[in-house]
Amino acid sequence: MSIRRHWLSLRLPLVLLLWGWVMVWSTVSGRLDLLLRAVYHPVVAIGGVLLMLIGALQMRVVLRGQAVRGQEVRVASQPLPRGWLLVVATAVALLLLPPRPSFNDLAVSRPSALPEAPRLAFVLPPEQRTLTEWVRLLRTQPDPSLHTGAPVSISGFVFQRPGETPQLARLMVRCCLADATPSGLPVQWPRDFTPSIDAWLQIKGTMVEETINGEVRNAVKPSEIKAIPRPARPLEP
């Protein structure tokens, strides 16, 4: 078998091994935390292991010239799709270039609708509620007077829709970023503080009332604003 023919025979096994490794490594390295809900990470890892096993078995067949039912198995007779180079380039890019999604850009393009909330979240002390739990509570109990003066301790990224004041938000996902839903809280930003879009902040303060276009709503009045690194798992279920 010539070197060229030998290489052609190994293309499919190598591609399977490469993509299997990408899936397993993305799970172990934590990159999937930026793209996929944690409960689905084992599915990706198992899929990667299976791809690597299939690739290894096919490579063994090619290298040993194993015969099946009296006929030599030739992986070269199973041509890869014409875009196989693109498939390989994509896998290499995923290994070399970590994902850096803009949560603000994604949130702007998504509707602000939240799934049903666990009832336990509503009975937590106010200072223990997450940003998402606060949003759910305000939607189920929209009377601003019920929450005015409550202590708040939340974290999230700065999110701004066109023409609106920046909010502090988190992304909710059922599966992955494709079905992400933003949940945001209005913030009365100090005059001497300009929030940077997509920046992650931790805010401590109190819940107050404000009137916007004749509508009374709750907003967070910060007493402390602290820049924080993006969480290892920024997506919330």
Stretch-by-stretch model annotation:
Residues 10-70:
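Membrane-embedded alpha-helical segments of integral membrane proteins
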Residues 47, 190-204:
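Short nucleic-acid-contacting surface segments enriched for D/E, G, S/T with interspersed K/R
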Residues 76-102:
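Internal/C-terminal transmembrane anchor helices
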Residues 97-158:
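Membrane-interface segments at or immediately adjacent to transmembrane helices
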Residues 152-158, 198-207:
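OB-fold and OB-like beta-barrel modules that bind single-stranded nucleic acids
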Residues 163-173, 216-218:
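Short aromatic-glycine-enriched beta-strand elements
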Residues 179-194:
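Beta-strand/loop nucleic-acid-binding surfaces
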Residues 212-236:
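OB-fold/S1-family single-stranded nucleic acid-binding modules
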